[in-house]
Swiss-Prot record:
This is UbiA prenyltransferase claS. Prenyltransferase; part of the gene cluster that mediates the biosynthesis of clavilactone A, a meroterpenoid that features a unique benzo-fused ten-membered carbocyclic ring unit with an alpha,beta-epoxy-gamma-lactone moiety, forming an intriguing 10/5/3 tricyclic nested skeleton. ClaR, ClaS and ClaT are sufficient to produce clavilactone A. Within the pathway, claS acts as an atypical UbiA prenyltransferase that transfers geranyl pyrophosphate (GPP) to hydroquinone (HYQ) instead of p-hydroxybenzoic acid (PHB), producing the first intermediate geranylhydroquinone. A motif (YxxxK) lies at residues 205-209. GO terms for cellular component: mitochondrial inner membrane. A motif (DxxxD) lies at residues 205-209. Pathway: Secondary metabolite biosynthesis; terpenoid biosynthesis. Belongs to the UbiA prenyltransferase family. It holds the Pfam family UbiA. The chain crosses the membrane at residues 30-52, 57-79, 99-121, 131-148, 155-177, 227-247, 250-270, 293-313. A motif (NDxxDxxxD) lies at residues 81-88.
Length: 313
């Protein structure tokens, strides 16, 4: 008993030292990983259906994509916190973040971030030239520039929409060495989806952002947020419809992904209170998990329909 009790303080101390690093990577806030992963999963499943990709190959690539999404999300959060630390100290929701609070130094954060990036580069090292190029762009310039956009434009979400959704064309490029028109159309919808959910997310901090000088579509759209977001919702559903037609998707996709996804967005936009931070967070969390899953479920059912349910089971 004496040995066990003597180890408890050191265990607690080790855990407390790890907490800032865990907080820095946002591994406990999985919604950010999912909004990176879903576009890749959508693109891959569309490609798998078109190519009749073997289930084992599909599953392996999907798992790698999920792991890469976890790493890229964490690296992006670290970089964002390094650049935004002065802003974060002025916003109630973010002032306790590890870099803003001084729990982690800039040097330590940079080393940690580059460790993530080196693993990501290793994962795409043997891919074809197009997938390699898209992967490098997805890892470095696109997410790297995003935090700066909040300083110079009220449309940072538009840039974020490009940065977070390259997974669609990446999935096609990795499996086929090219990307079809359907993947571009779906990417437009995913871009609109990012503006949709990140505008809702930004509504949590509207008052603090005004004081800190942070720009966002939540401030730009003002009292017209819901009408504007309904327009972006229409773009999302329209792109799902058109990309499905171009990719020769069948009934399961149109019923679940297009119909179910559209119903989810409409219901969510009707219910969310954009002046209540908790309601905004719940809506963001819902679209990050539920909308993405609904769209993927339709794609997965259609893939099973194409290759034969027996192959999936």
């Amino acid at each position: 008993m004496a040995v066990a009790s003597s180890t408890r303080p050191s265990q607690k101390q080790s855990t407390s030292k790890l907490q800032p690093w865990i907080q820095l990577t946002r591994v406990r806030k999985f919604a950010g990983t999912m909004v990176l992963f879903w576009p890749f999963a959508w693109g891959l499943t569309m490609a798998a259906r078109a190519l009749l990709l073997p289930v084992q190959t599909f599953g392996t690539i999907l798992a790698c994509g999920f792991f890469a999404s976890c790493l890229l999300h964490s690296a992006g959060c670290i970089w964002n916190d390094i650049l935004d630390q002065d802003f974060d100290r002025q916003v109630e929701r973010t002032k306790s973040r590890p870099i803003a609070s001084g729990a982690i130094s800039n040097t330590g954060a940079l080393i940690f971030m580059f460790a993530h990036l080196f693993i990501l580069m290793g994962m795409i090292w043997t891919s074809n030239s197009l997938a390699w190029m898209i992967g490098i762009i997805s890892i470095f310039p696109l997410p790297g520039i995003y935090p700066l956009m909040k300083r110079i434009t009220y449309w940072p979400q538009a840039w974020l929409g490009i940065a977070l959704n390259t997974g669609i064309v990446m999935a096609w490029a990795y499996t086929t060495g090219t990307y079809p028109t359907s993947s571009i159309v779906l990417s437009v919808g995913a871009w609109a989806w990012t503006i949709y959910y990140d505008t809702i997310y930004a509504c949590q901090d509207k008052k603090d952002d005004i004081n800190a000088g942070v720009k966002s579509t939540a401030l730009l759209f003002g009292s017209y947020i819901k009408p504007v977001l309904s327009l972006f919702g229409s773009i999302i559903v329209g792109s799902l419809l058109i990309s499905g037609i171009l990719n020769n998707q069948e009934l399961p996709y149109f019923l679940v992904s297009v119909g179910g996804g559209g119903l989810h967005l409409a219901t969510q936009l009707w219910q969310v209170d954009l002046d209540t931070p908790k309601s905004c967070w719940n809506a963001f969390h819902s679209t990050a998990f539920n909308f993405g899953a609904i769209v993927w479920a339709g794609l997965l059912l259609d893939y099973a329909w194409a290759v034969g349910v027996g192959a999936i089971m």
